C-alpha cells in the first residue's frame, strides 16, 4: 500500500496524521508539486492531485482516504461511537471549505479577508476525526503564514500537539 504525498500539502497532512494515529504501515511516495510527474497525472487525472492511496486500486481525495482508513482500520477509532456525533464530525469535514479552506487560501494569496475570525469560529475539540481534518491548515496558518491564532484555537492546537502524529506534522511544516 502506497500513499502518494507532498510534504507541503495540508490535504496530504490529513492522510499522514491518520496513518500515524492508526499505526498503519505504508510506503510514502513524496512528489514535488512544482514539478508534478506525469505518472501522477496518469494515476489521478486530470490534474494529478494528492494525496492518492494506491492499494491495488486508486483512491484520491483526503476525505475519502480518511474514511477508508477509519473503516479499514477501526482501532483506534477516530470517529465518536455515537451515531449522531459521527454524523456531526462528518458534517464538519463536509463544510471545511466554507468553514476555513476558502479563507485560508484567499489569505495565502494576499486577499483581504477575516481568516482570524474564521479560525475563531471553528467548531473544534468535538471529534478527533474532524480535528485532524482542520489542524493541517491551522498549523500552516500559524507557522507558514504568521497568523496569530485566537486563544481558544491556540489552546486547542497546543493540546493536539501533545499527540505524536500532530507533533510530527508541526515539525515537518517548520522544516519546509
Give the ranges of each region predicted by the language model.
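GST-like domain detector, emphasizing the conserved glutathione-binding G-site
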Residues: 1-123
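A local structural micro-motif
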Residues: 27, 150, 168-169
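Short, solvent-exposed turn/loop segments enriched in Gly/Ser/Thr/Pro and often Arg
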Residues: 32, 129, 173
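Phosphate-coordinating loops and pocket residues in cytosolic domains that bind phosphorylated ligands
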Residues: 42, 162, 171
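GST-like fold's C-terminal all-alpha helical module
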Residues: 84, 92-165
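Terminal-tail/helix-coil boundary detector
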Residues: 169-176
